[in-house]
């Protein structure tokens, strides 16, 4: 998984010893700047070369002799310096974005973990109220199926890309979600397979591996706050861990969730907390977009000069 991955050593790091499975490259600085050579390893050409030359084994690898065949474009030193400078700006923005994400996630955790836990979930939320069997309702039609793999681990992302013909629906495809529903994976919940759905796409069915939690009244308890509690509350995670049996596939059930304790807050307090966290999440989303675009921006710089 790490074959072709690169790292540049700088004197500021201090003395270092590298592992025997790594290869060190030293360059004639009159012709190639090390930082420039390092920037080439972020190029599409380099990544394609790695894919072509890595061994098709359980532990893919590329040896030193193979690396010696990789051709590096060598522009004038002043052009190399310009490339390094421009890519350096992108990397700085990238690092700043990562720091912002870490800070905002920490801030969200502090907000959530500053709340108490005094009331049972069942007092304010209904769980798994709607079901549907797509094999009979949509026998010859396609529907969207959300299974455990469709929900990200710890990021709240959810994919609606899986389309299945009704007659081919798995037996676990039964749960129906309404708008403003909290999705909780009941298997290995410590992986945080949780999500919040503000608006559910038509003809969407969820696996019975999820618990679907819907506020009895959004004016009493905001569903999105419950999602944030599942995602960030240390206390709620401890309750889940306590409820899980010591088995190969530790899980929680509806009765467990019914009795988990959550904070009892006024609706104004809830709205304030949700607004705070949404603002922090918006910054996180922008930072992640910047990080996602970094590779293509670096490539654009290389295309511009090489």
Label each region the model flagged:
Residues 69-136, 142, 259, 264-274, ...:
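Non-catalytic DNA-recognition/assembly elements of restriction-modification systems
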Residues 1-42, 173-175, 179, 183-233:
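A short beta-sheet element
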Residues 46-50, 235-240:
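Periplasmic-binding protein-like
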Residues 8-10, 53-56, 196-198, 242-246:
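Short amphipathic beta-strand starts and helix->beta connectors
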Residues 3, 117-156, 164, 168-173, ...:
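Low-complexity, Lys/Gly-biased intrinsically disordered segments
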Residues 12, 57, 165, 171-172, ...:
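A structural connector/turn signal
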Residues 15-23, 55-78, 190, 204-211, ...:
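A short glycine-rich beta-alpha junction/loop motif
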């Amino acid at each position: 998984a790490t074959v072709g991955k690169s790292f540049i050593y700088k004197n500021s790091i201090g003395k270092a010893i590298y592992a025997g499975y790594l290869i060190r490259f030293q360059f004639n600085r009159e012709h190639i700047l090390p930082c420039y050579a390092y920037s080439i390893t972020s190029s599409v050409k380099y990544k394609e070369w790695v894919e072509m030359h890595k061994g098709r084994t359980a532990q893919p690898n590329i040896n030193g002799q193979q690396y010696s065949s990789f051709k590096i474009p060598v522009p004038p030193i002043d052009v190399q310096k310009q490339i390094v400078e421009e890519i350096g700006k992108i990397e700085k923005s990238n690092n700043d974005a990562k720091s912002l994400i870490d800070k905002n996630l920490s801030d969200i955790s502090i907000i959530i973990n500053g709340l108490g836990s005094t009331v049972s979930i069942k007092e304010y939320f209904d769980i798994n109220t709607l079901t549907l069997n797509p094999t009979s309702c949509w026998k010859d039609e396609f529907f969207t199926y959300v299974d455990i793999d469709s929900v990200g681990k710890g990021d709240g992302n959810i994919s609606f890309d899986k389309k299945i013909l009704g007659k081919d629906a798995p037996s676990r495809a039964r749960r129906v979600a309404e708008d403003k529903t909290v999705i909780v994976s009941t298997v290995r919940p410590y992986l945080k397979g949780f999500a919040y759905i503000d608006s559910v796409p038509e003809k969407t069915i969820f696996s019975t591996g999820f618990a679907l939690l819907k506020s009895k009244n959004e004016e009493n308890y905001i569903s999105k706050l419950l999602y944030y509690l599942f995602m960030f509350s240390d206390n709620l995670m401890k309750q889940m861990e306590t409820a899980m049996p010591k088995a190969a596939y530790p899980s929680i059930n509806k009765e467990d969730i019914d009795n988990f304790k959550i904070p009892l807050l006024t609706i104004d307090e809830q709205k304030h907390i949700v607004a705070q966290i949404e603002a922090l999440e918006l910054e996180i989303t922008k930072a992640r977009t910047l990080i996602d675009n970094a590779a293509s921006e670096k490539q654009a710089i290389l295309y511009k000069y090489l």
